[in-house]
Amino acid sequence: MSTDITTRTDVNTQIAETGIFSTVNASTMEGKAAVYKALNDATPLRDVVGETLSVKDIIVQRVEVETDEGDVVEQPRTSLITSDGAAYSATSNGVFSAVKNILGIFGHPSTWESPLKVVVEEKATRRNAMYRYLTLSLV
């Protein structure tokens, strides 16, 4: 079982090698447009906290962000594409961790019988209740 999970979809390796991971079939113009929209015009996940999304595809892109101290660090930007074609994204380790778990357990979205329903949640960190993070929960 453990090798099954790691060989299904190795997100970290693909991001390290190419800077991006995508489950979208980009062999068509429609697929390429979906990737473009997800990377450039997605609704922030923070805007849909508490809502249920029917996820059909996932894109994770390595991006550079500036910290409060002015340092530039790399973070994963995760984009979720829903069954109605909408795209939602967040630069959040919590969402990225949830997506890795989803892919590890459920496999590549092309193998899903139907879109996966998730709820966007915002939670406080364990160490400091002032800092919050986004995550996904299954419905």
What positions do the PLM features span?
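OB-fold ssDNA-binding interfaces and closely related basic DNA-contact patches used
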Residues: M1-S83, R126-R127, T135-V139
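N-terminal start-of-chain detector that recognizes signal peptides
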Residues: N25-S27, S89-T91, F106
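Generic hydrophobic, helix-prone segments enriched in Leu/Val/Ile
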Residues: L53-V55, V99-I102, V120, L134-L136
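GIY-YIG-like beta-to-alpha core
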Residues: Y88-K100
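Short nucleic-acid-contacting surface segments enriched for D/E, G, S/T with interspersed K/R
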Residues: A98-V119
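Short, charged beta-turn/beta-strand-edge "cap" motif at the junction between a beta-strand
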Residues: H108-S110, V119-V139
